Amino acid sequence: NSAKISYGELHQFTYLLNEPLLNKEGEVLQNTQTVHTQSYIFRNDGKEPATNVELIFNYAPMYLNVWPSRLFAEKSDSSRRYVMVFDYLAPKETIRCEVLAINTQIPMLLSVRCKEGVAQNMVLMPQKVFHPAFINSL
């Protein structure tokens, strides 16, 4: 009976924008732009709190959103990797992390761990939701 962190990638997408990238003088640098998004979910599936939950990215994301809104510390390790540290994740608590980058790649999520252990990666797939009446008739 301890903390058990799991995480997975909910989705990712690349938008191709038909908007030119301009320099300060208004000259076109690129005819189109790209916006990359990636969404992760983190969950404590255990029966005890997870403490010092660390999300380690290859480098700091251009834009980052955490939902529900949570306070976290930002650090970098000796290799200048970007580390987000959440002090606490309650049993059955879930947080999402959305990353966005414009005209550049999104940093890779390298590691997820907490004081109680290393997180387990879970593969997520879209699933059709059936009406309860249909399920109960089986």
Q: Model segments located where?
A:
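Asparagine-centered strand-capping/turn motif at beta-strand->loop junctions
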Residues: 27, 36, 40-49, 54-59
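A general secondary-structure signal for short beta-strands and their flanking turns/coil
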Residues: 33-37, 50-52, 79, 94-96
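Short acidic, flexible loop segments centered on an aromatic residue
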Residues: 50-75, 114-115
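Preference for bulky hydrophobic residues occupying beta-strand positions
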Residues: 40, 55-57, 84, 97-99, ...
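Terminal connector regions
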Residues: 2-22, 91, 98-138
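Intrinsically disordered, low-complexity Pro/Gly/Ser/Thr-rich segments with frequent PxxP/GP/PP motifs
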Residues: 69-105
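Sterically constrained small-residue positions within well-ordered secondary structures
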Residues: 31-33, 46, 88
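Short, solvent-exposed beta-strand/turn "edge" segments of beta-rich domains on protein surfaces
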Residues: 15-35
